[in-house]
Structure formats: C-alpha cells, structure tokens
C-alpha cells in the first residue's frame, strides 16, 4: 500500500543534523536543488518498469520536490533549481540538495570508484557560495565517498532508494515523523574499502543514526 511504502521511508538514516531538521513549515523560502529532487526514476532505481530503471516520470508517484511542496505552508516559497544557480532574486538560508546515483542493475552498476558526481558537488558548492545552509539527501544503493565533503554540509541523510513515495522523505524533514533508521552496516571512510579494510577507518559505525 502507499502508506506502507511511505512508512518504509521513515527507516532512512539522518546522519548529520546541525539544527536543520525538523525544518519549519512556515519558512519564508526553501531552495530544492539537485538531479534527484524531481526525478521519480532516480528515487526508484533499477528493476523499476524496466531492467535498468530510468530517469524522470517513469511511473506514478510523488517526487521529493512535490513532497516538500505538499508539506510546507502555502506562504512558503519553494524554489526548484536543478544546479543551484537560477534562483532569481529570492533570498533565503536553506537549500535541500538531492544527489546520488543514476539507476542501475547488476553489472551496469560496477564502478571503479564510488565518488560523487562532479555535477552534484558543483550544485552544492553553488549554494554554499551563495550563503545557504545545505541539507544533502543522498539517493544510492550503497555507501558512497562523502568523507571529503561532509564538513561542507550542514545536514546529511542517506535516503537510499525511497521509491515512489517522496512524501515519506518530506515527512522526516519537516518533523511529521521521526526517522527511525540506524545503519545496518558500517559506512567506510573510503567506500571502495568496504568491510575488507576496517583498519582504514569508518565514517559511521553500525547502528548509527540520529
């Protein structure tokens, strides 16, 4: 059911929160940016409609952007900017940036490294350069290399593949439901090390989640 799909999203992990979550529903304005903000296909990942999944409106559902719009006051202006540049003359202090992996299945997901895309990093930097506090939501099927970037982020949540119910994500962001998620495995400093090189250190240990 839709309710059970949304409730599953509440198990995602908030891993860094510098007084951003819960976000006020009465905020004057909120910027929502990133490739994944308005992308159902990216939310769902592989094995969705097609073998490799797809981008955009490949099925019926609620994007994270739409979930945010439904959560806030009618007086709150939600500005959608894919790369964090075209904001017009709107002033504000909070940007929610949805980044992560494109859909994949099986060996198509094999990669030499698990670094963030330069496009995603640039979007975040565009907003930080404008003075915004940035809350990063990472869509992925595995831990990625974020250690070098985390200090630049004011908040971070691993939302994995939330599926069609983007409103489940916004419920957590705006305090309608408390995130109950705890990591079921460690998040390494370098994702390529995984569990095979614990001596290289961990970013987050098993069971972590705010």
Predicted regions mapped to residue ranges:
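A structural supersecondary motif
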Residues: 196-210
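Generic beta-strand/beta-sheet core signal
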Residues: 24-26, 33-36, 40-42, 81-83, ...
